[in-house]
């Protein structure tokens, strides 16, 4: 009987399979979502503020928004500042 139970317990019911597939689809959608509509304007505004104090190339500023599990969003801002000698 134990051998029969072993083989029968390995089968997954269709609800669990469907749940796993749906979780995969949701995770893929979260990763592939387009950036929010406000992100380009946010990048532009941040660049304008930085340019008030330091002359930089607009390509030296990157803004990324990363979605984590649940309702957590991480805004990553990378700015490459010129050398101190170039500021004078």
From Swiss-Prot:
Keywords: Cell cycle, Cell division. One of its GO terms (molecular function) is ATPase activator activity. InterPro entries: MinE, MinE_sf. The keyword Cell division applies. The keyword Isomerase does not apply. Disruption phenotype: In a minCDE operon disruption (minC-minD-minE), cells divide not only at midpoint but also at their poles, yielding small minicells and long rods. Loss of polar localization of several polar-localized proteins including GroEL-GroES, TnaA and YqjD. One of its GO terms (cellular component) is cytosol. GO terms for biological process: division septum site selection; regulation of division septum assembly. Belongs to the MinE family. Prevents the cell division inhibition by proteins MinC and MinD at internal division sites while permitting inhibition at polar sites. This ensures cell division at the proper site by restricting the formation of a division septum at the midpoint of the long axis of the cell. This is Cell division topological specificity factor.
């Amino acid at each position: 009987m134990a051998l029969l139970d072993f083989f029968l317990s390995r089968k997954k019911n269709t609800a669990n399979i469907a749940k796993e597939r749906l979780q995969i689809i949701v995770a893929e959608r979260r990763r592939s979502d387009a950036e929010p509509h406000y992100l380009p304007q946010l990048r532009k505004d941040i660049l304008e503020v930085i340019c008030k104090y330091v002359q930089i190339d607009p390509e030296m500023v990157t803004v990324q928004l990363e979605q984590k599990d649940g309702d957590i969003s991480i805004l990553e801002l990378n700015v490459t500042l010129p050398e101190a000698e170039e500021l004078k």
